[in-house]
Structure formats: structure tokens, C-alpha cells
């Protein structure tokens, strides 16, 4: 056993914990009298320096004596007695004389319980916390808590007892020469530490951050702080088992305490957020350079610069960096931003020159790269600031009564592209289309960074952070663009809404995948599912679903057999994913390189969902024991099918998955006909009658709103319905002189075709 001076990083020895461990020492009455009674164990603490197999040595102030162990006597304890947690956790025997009082010596040590799989465990005695309790007949090492139910080692740091706190104060008194008056103040310091910090695995805090928090506390309470070295000893005496690590980039690394964090309900969390917010607001974002994470920000003036001109991260920044490092291993930080297409206005715009168009392209590229950088570093709260800077949001903000003016980086951007010219460009339809395309590329890259594999386990804290980020996006962007033309706002919000919805869907899919993984790994559940599935009357299911789905009977039977075979093989989640991907490939193969693939893909999703719901209904009516497992699997497979199909459609159309989903996001500016493009001919029979009376050619357009025109091709689908060729804005159409028969010809700005306008429809000439 080691002394407290050995340091928290020392190797912990392991002593097997058995049900018969008392030892009978040869202790004289005088020596027993010198011990401290159990009732007073919180007042006196004695350190045990060494424990040998045949000897027990007590380290006392005056006399160090070694006593030979006596005859070992066996005691029986039940498992509930041994492993249940209670306030003391001490076991001792009072044999040998009714009048002898039990004695206690507190050992400074940590505890960890390792389960070896057969119901027994080993207790590791480390550096502080256990107790050796003696009576007339035995000594027993007792721990504060043990966990024998865990399937793996449950080693963790523990918090000090009141006796250990007093010992820490006494140690500081001796080592630092503190007066009794100053040492009495340490109680409040220690209580503050216990109220605001807790031990946790996988996290760290910079040593400077803890000390800065402590200095702030002392300043607020008008207390005299101890120096940094004494504070470090105080931390280690309270939170046992802390390790020290040096984290950070080369030349700018800092020492961190590993295994401690700020409590979630501590006011220090708010302090850290405010410090980071203030540092950000004072940071002029230099758009001509790629925006870097907090620890690499350029342009901060004042005391945060070292003599070499490099930015020295503040304590709050270091804390944020350290806490994000654990989650960054789940991201794909190697992904770069794709190249953007060139912006071509097609015609001159009054008040805007070619240099302004070039400046917009350059600034927006740098803006998107900055967004990608902060997302890679999980600094989601910086996105709002980047948007406000680019879109010239100039309103002042207030934090706790302090008015903060926006950073001076606006002037640098204003010099490259004045706000008035930016607004002129934002009114041009070509800029809307170009920026929408750029946004889809950027948001798709962000999705693949944050969730590179939807089936890979993601920490719940990271999942929640992503979902909170998605929830805030639309509000941040709308607020930042408050002075921008509404049409541009609609374009931007449509893209960011698709991005937010994709993040929500993918995190939900990931959550379902982890829940289903446990089911697929359970052999008994799989066997029960297979047994219940074999009782389903699939012929009856096919008969009921055939009128709605109109699926080929051979395809349905093949899918049924493949599903049962895959289930019987007890396939893993990844194997099921490969099977689902193969199903999508087989179903969509006849539509490859055809414009009808998007509709065929959507129809497949509807049919898959309807057919699977019929199977679930049959299982429900039969009261299948595995109904819950099937319901979970069905939810996962439906969602994963959606994921696969949207990527197949994106690949076939040359769009991103975000772009495919973005077609349906802007519901405020699109009519219901635009939401269900493939069903326009069924939804508007009046239009069909009008077109028949006018005897129009095969291609037609329906002007459903003043600002949206749909391009339809009559009879293009196998069932005779009309396929949607595309959507254009009226501003892209240049009117020509009217022709005979009351027809008005128009030519698209893109030069794709010539169309004829009749009433509220457009038809090709």
C-alpha cells in the first residue's frame, strides 16, 4: 500500500477481497488504548505506509510498530452483505472480550472493483479512502462502495471523505506553513470544489482553468487564495485518482487534469460560455483567410497575443477544446469542401460590375470554408456569428446588461463587397440558383463530416449536440439575414431546412440502429422472431396488398425468402444493411439512366412501407411474442431504405442528397402541387380538360403561382401520367410579341426551349 505522497499517477496494487480476511494481531492493552474509537473516526486520521503478507504496520506520529499477524479465522458473509452499498461499508468482529471497543485507522486509498465473471471480484487499493477496522480479534479492510454487478472492470475515481479533507488541510498546514486562521478558510474552498466539480471518465480540464475558476471564487467571496502549487495538492486530495496529461498542439500544449469536469448544474458552465462568447465577439473574422478553430484564430488583439505574435488560447477556449477532442474521433475531419460552379449572371446588372461578382464568389467560398472548419471542431455556436458577419448583421447585442457591438471584421468585408451591391446581387435570380447549389454542396459535406456512417455508434452527448445544432439553424440564419431581400432569405432557409431535417433523420436512424443492434445480437430473440414470422400467412398478405402495391408476385416471394434466410443466419446489422442495399439495387435496376427513376424510387418506398405494415398487422393480430422486436426492426429498415433511396436518386440525377430533399423544404413559397410533383395530373383534372380543349402539344407548363412554373410532359410515364421535367421562375422567361391565336411565345433565359403561353399554362412551340 502506498502513501499519499506517492502521487495520484502511481500504479495501484490489487488485493483480492475474500469473505474470510480478519487477522488476529498481538496488540497490548496500552496499544489498543492508543487507537481512536470508531465513534471518533472522523476526527483522527492515521496513515498506513506499508502492508505486507505477514505483517501489518501502523505509521503513527511517535512510534512505528510492526505487529505479526495471528491465526486467521474464517467468517462467512452473504453476497448482499458484501456487495450492497451502504453508508459505511465496514465489517468487523468483536470476539475475544465483550468490553473491548472496535478501533479504526483510515487508509488513504482508492477503490476499484473488477468482476472476474464468476461472482467474485478483486478490490484494488490505491491512494485514498479505505478503512482498516480493528476489534479485539480482527483487522478488516473496508471500502466505501463496491460494484459487483458490472460485466467489466468498474474502476473509477472517488471523492474524499470528511476525514480525508481534514487530513488534506493538515498536510497543507505543514507543507505550506499556513496559519490556523487561513487553514480554517480552506473548508469553504473545499466545499466549493465539491459543489462545482465531479469526476468523470474520458474528459479533462486545463489546470489553469481550474485555478482561474478558484481565483474568481476567492475574489467574489473576498477570500485569500492559496498559490497554484497548493491548489494542485488540494485538488488531488479531494478528487482522487486524477491523472495529468499534456494536451494541445506542439508549442502550445497545456497540462490538463484528466478525469474531472465541471458539474452540469454548476454556474461555472455559464461562466465558460460567456467567456467564449466575449472572446468571439471581440474577434474580427478575417474572411481572406480560412477560419480556424478557436485555438488557431488570428486577429485577436490585446493580452491574448504572445511576443511571437501567436494567439494564446484563454482558459475557456482550452476547456472547450479539451472537451471536444473525445467527440472528434467520431467525425470525418478529412473531408474537404467541393469546388463551386462559376457564377454567371448572363446579363449586366445595374450598379454591379464583374469585380463585384468575383468578390461575391470569393467571399462566399471563404465563408463556406469557415463554416466547415468550425463544424469539424464542433464549435456550433460560432455558425451564427459567421452568418451575421457575411450578411452584414449590424445590430448590437446584449449579454447580462452589457451591450456588445459587432466586430470590426465587417469593415474588411465591406471594403471587398459593399453591402449595397450585395443586396443588388441578392435580387438576381442567377445568384439565387448559384448560391442554392453551393449550399447543397456545403451542407452535404457537413452531413458527411458529422455522421460519416449512420450505422456506427455515436455517443449520446454528440447526438444531442447535433440535434440541438439542427434545431437552432433556421432561427440563426433568419435573424442574420434580417436586412436581406426576402427571396434570397427563402432560398437560403430552404437549403438550411433540408440540412437540419437531414441531421435529425440521420441521428434518429443512428439511434434506431444501435437499439436494433442489440436485438440482432440476441439469439433467443432472433429464434422467436423466425418462429413468429413462419406463422404469418404471406399469401393472404400478398392478396391484400396486391391491389395497392401492384407488386410482382415473384419479387415479393423472393424478398420473403431472402428475409427469412438472412434472419435465420443471425446476420449482423452490417449484413442486414448490405441486404437492404442489394434489394434497392435490384428494384431500381430497370430504371437506371432513365428520368423516371426518382418516381420509381418513391413508389418503391411507399410499397415497401405498406407491405411491411401488413406483415406487422398480421403479427399483431396473432399476438406474436416478438412483436416489439419486429416493430423496432421495421422502423429501422424503413428509415434505412429511405436513406438508400435518396442517395440513389441523388446519384442518378447528379444532385446531392441534400439537394434532392431540398426540393420539398420551402413549403411557404411552393404550392401543394409542387410538393407532389408526380401527382400533378391527378390533382388538377380541370387543367387536363383545358389542355384537351386547346389541343396543345405533349409538353405543357402549369403556372400554379405567380412565381413558380412547372414543366410537365404529358403521358411520359408508363401509367400515362405526366412527368415533371423541371421548375422555372417567371423572371427567367423573356416575353416575345404576341402571335396569332392569342398565343404568347416565350424563350427561357437558359435557352433550353421555346414555349407558348395559353391562360395559366405554357406549352412548347
Curated annotation (Swiss-Prot):
Keywords from the UniProt entry: Developmental protein, Differentiation, DNA-binding, Nucleus, Repressor, Transcription, Transcription regulation
Show the Gene3D superfamilies listed in the entry.
Answer: Winged helix-like DNA-binding domain superfamily/Winged helix DNA-binding domain
> Where in the cell is the protein located?
Nucleus
Q: State if DNA-binding is listed as a keyword.
A: yes
Whereabouts does the entry annotate DNA binding, in residue ranges?
189-264
- Give the similarity note: Belongs to the RFX family.
* Name the UniProt record assigns to this protein: Transcription factor RFX3
Organism field: Danio rerio (Zebrafish)
